[in-house]
Amino acid sequence: MVNQTHSKMHISKVNEVYLNLEVDSALGQELTDYFTFDVPGAKFMPMYKKRIWDGKIRLYSQKTGKIYCGLLPYIKKFCSKNSVEYILEEGIEDDRNLIREDVRKFTESLRPKSKGKKLDIRDYQTNAILHSLRKHRSLIISPTASGKSLIIYALVRYYNLLLKDKKILILVPTTSLVEQMYSDFIDYGWSDKYVHRIYSGHERTTDKPVVVSTWQSLYKLPKKYFEDFGCIIGDEAHLFKARSLTNILTKLENCKYRHGFTGTLDGTQTHRLILEGLFGSVEKVVSTKDLIDTNTLAKLTVKCVVLKHPQEECKKVKGSKYAEEIDYLVDNSSRNKFICRLCDNLSGNTLVLFQLVEKHGKVLYDMMKDFDRKVFFVYGGTDTETRENIRAITEKERSAIIVASYGTFSTGINIRNLHNIVFSSPSKSRIRVLQSIGRGLRTSSTKNSTVVFDIADDLSHGHWTNFT
């Protein structure tokens, strides 16, 4: 509890990244404790093991007084909880006074279309656009197939009119998503003369007002490069590496308009607060359940297939570490044959997700490539154009199999005509699992349901149980 004799705070704005909290040392220590969090899994990290780092992240610096602008609601909550009087400098809160109907009319005026057909703007999309434009900063939770790209498109078109001499930067985690965002904008009806793409092999400088780039292409660039941008939009924000995301967004010191988009947060407070601090407060526009109930998304069935391994094998694996257990599973020929038979017997298009390329993905592909159906292999080394071609071909197929790494196909890739998803490798990432399921939730003219096959393994022996 804050000492009542030290209960005043002056909040000023340093730039579009940081606020400054002017407090005495006692209150500063309370703030430090309040905004300090344990990093999940820190004990496994080299810096922690070497005792160079204590495994905590501190979002408030008592030394500088700085804290991310997006954490203002949490600062107010701290003050309210601890009876701290605060003075907020004028201009820090400057919500734009917008009317919902005006936002709806603006979005309608863009006349967005897909494959030549007019797109209807859903109410929750209008709400998301309104919230973002009013607040200037936001973190929009928008699940798969909720029309997130259209929300981003409307924001980009609005800021393109508003920011006469500034550009708009859209950051995505993969080259495939650069191409997908670009093609979506063109599909909606915009000209390519407005949009520039950046990833390996593309120029980083352009006169075009909108730049779509992977964060990997930009995070090492100097602060001066980012001076031209007045708006930053981060798509699939949950996948940005914390240090790289922080690196880019803290260089955008004069970038007022900041919007992050994600379908999933990882459930940890640290993850959420970093994203909210760099972008803005969380706003959930619609739930996956709502979209399924209204038939916007496909009906979902999850089938957990538990493979009981022979006791003599279980005895060999008993006491193994997680990585050793994974090595055993991906190298297990009986298990791999079962996965291949399962995929061959499924009707419709099937996505098989794996974790280890050489040890597992390549093995599964080699076992399936002679099936009497089209089988594709996608991993990190597959170039962007090939991935796009595979995606396009699969949309027209009825019985294709894509053997793909989690990293390339678990997030953001749109394949409407996907009937089955098979998890051939275990994954400990909550985000990865949820995003992977999202790949199959889009509907198409040939599909209104999706089945997810989660392959689990029972290697228990005596009182010992395995990880997976």
Feature roles, as predicted:
Residues 230, 238-303:
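Post-DEXD/H (motif II) to motif III coupling segment of the RecA-like Helicase ATP-binding lobe
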Residues 168, 175-199, 372:
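Conserved helix-turn-beta segment of the N-terminal RecA-like "Helicase ATP-binding" lobe
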Residues 135-157:
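Walker A/P-loop
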Residues 264, 379-468:
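Conserved RecA-like P-loop NTPase helicase motor core
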Residues 317-355, 359-367:
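Conserved interdomain hinge at the start of the Helicase C-terminal
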Residues 200-231, 241-247, 408:
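Conserved helix/coil segment N-terminal to the catalytic DExD/H
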Residues 89-141:
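Conserved pre-motif I regulatory segment
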Residues 179, 194-206, 351, 362-363, ...:
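Conserved helicase ATPase core of P-loop NTP-dependent helicases/translocases
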